[in-house]
Amino acid sequence: MDQPTDLRGGGALPVTAPHPLDNAVTAPHPLDNAVWAALTGPHAHLAERLGRAARYPADVYAFAALADPADPAAWADLHALAGPGTTVRVKPVDDVPDGWEVVGAGRGVQLVDTALRAEPAPEAVRLGPADVPEILDLVARTRPGPFLARTVELGTYLGIRHHGRLVALAGERLRLPGWTEISAVCTDPEHRGRGLATRLVRAVAAGIRARGDVPFLHAAADNTPAIRLYRSLGFTLRRSSRIVVLRTPGTPAARTGVAPHDTLSEVAPDGSGTPWTEVTA
């Protein structure tokens, strides 16, 4: 079983108030099951839920979650929710029940803000539904991870434009009590090396902190350059976990089309299905 990393060893910073991680080692923490905490918390209005299993709509974020990955009843609920012969992404998962086929697997790391300099970026603009075609184009060229037609509904997304063209992006994905994930960090290859990604990460973090939340993020466990960048910005490695793409037991019912939840064929270590590539600040 994966365990959180104690962040306070080796010369801790002075503490004037309890930090959200104070009980991370001794008690279950929302970040240990972040997708479930989001779907049963601030993102409950987006959840497709059955008992102890839940998932996001297929065009929002292609992940499902279990209240307790060690609970057979939660797996039974996920099977009923997803249906037979369907592929689902789930994290974190250590052991998969008999009858569930592992289609793909990888490891990701979770990092939390402990010393990030958060500040607005005057050149950043807020992005909305009208900007989704441009966002999808940038994401397709830079491959920061999944971004779907309605992902923008998860939180605030900021972008930087050059001569009117979107060249950099970052925003909020998972939101759970006290915590918000920074995601979709990417920069057009022609505009890297200018610090655009760093400015957007700090700007998104400023908005997260303004409402009293702590920023966190995920990266592929083997993406050393990305992890190095995030740590240099003030994020601390908290934990590593396993992400899986599974096919549920049974034969799918006949249908005329293939639902987006059924189109997954592989999973990167960050759970995105594609490698996280933006590492240039």
What are these regions (language model features)?
Residues M1-V96:
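N-terminal charged segments
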Residues D2-D32, Q110, T114-G145, T251, ...:
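Short amphipathic alpha-helix that is part of the acyltransferase structural core
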Residues A73-L78, G193-I208, I227-S232:
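Conserved acetyl-CoA-binding loop-helix of GNAT-fold acetyltransferases
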Residues P146-T156, I160-T187:
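A conserved beta-strand-loop-helix scaffold within acyl/acetyltransferase catalytic domains
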